[in-house]
Amino acid sequence: MKKIGIFGGTFDPPHNGHLLMANEVLHQAELDEIWFMPNKIPPHKQNEDFTDSRHRVEMLKLAISSNSGFKLELAEMDRKGPSYTYDTVRLLKERHPNDKLFFIIGADMIEYLPKWYKLDELLTLIQFIGVRRPGYHIETPYPLLFADVPEFDVSSTMLRERLKAKEPTQYLMPDKVRQYIEENDLYES
């Protein structure tokens, strides 16, 4: 039985903060693997524009390529419509019935758990790992495991803005991702 952490996100673009968080959770929770799972249409971001799925997947492949504990899971990319965690987890449990699945969420998402689609059913299928960050006070009635991650103040939104303004992004994202973005003229407008 493998212990697998599922790390969902738009990863638009993936950055070193994502990698730092995943690596800390991998070790603190003693997981075998972290599966990076890009969302196609996150329910809480349905009115936003995203970079083409193909580019986000390619950037993510490049970002995680140097860590053997990191894998890519495309279950949500293969589906139509909003990406509800409950539906995805049911599918992954069917595909991997002997593995123990953990779903990784940031401190900012913990307060939104009561609004998650079919949360009570989801809690019977998976264990959540909440990532604590400085500045967030976390209180929740839900049975979460916690991981502490050093503060690394970077976001995909900030990177898109820096890229658009032609500001430096070195050390904020993997060099391979930065090169892919430049070669494919992403985030310029």
From Swiss-Prot:
N-terminal signal peptide: none
GO process terms (BP): NAD biosynthetic process
Pfam entry (one): CTP_transf_like
Reaction it catalyzes: nicotinate beta-D-ribonucleotide + ATP + H(+) = deamido-NAD(+) + diphosphate
Presence of keyword NAD: yes
Enzyme class: transferase
Gene Ontology molecular function: ATP binding; nicotinate-nucleotide adenylyltransferase activity
UniProt-listed InterPro entries: Cyt_trans-like, NadD/NMNAT, Rossmann-like_a/b/a_fold
Gene3D superfamilies linked: HUPs
Origin: domain of life: Bacteria
Key words of the record: ATP-binding, NAD, Nucleotide-binding, Nucleotidyltransferase, Pyridine nucleotide biosynthesis, Transferase
SUPFAM superfamilies on file: Nucleotidylyl transferase
Function: Catalyzes the reversible adenylation of nicotinate mononucleotide (NaMN) to nicotinic acid adenine dinucleotide (NaAD).
HAMAP family: NaMN_adenylyltr
Family per similarity comment: Belongs to the NadD family.
Entry-linked PANTHER family: NICOTINATE-NUCLEOTIDE ADENYLYLTRANSFERASE-RELATED, PHOSPHOPANTETHEINE ADENYLYLTRANSFERASE
Protein name per its UniProtKB record: Probable nicotinate-nucleotide adenylyltransferase
Species name: Bacillus velezensis (strain DSM 23117 / BGSC 10A6 / LMG 26770 / FZB42) (Bacillus amyloliquefaciens subsp. plantarum)
Lineage: Bacteria, Bacillati, Bacillota, Bacilli, Bacillales
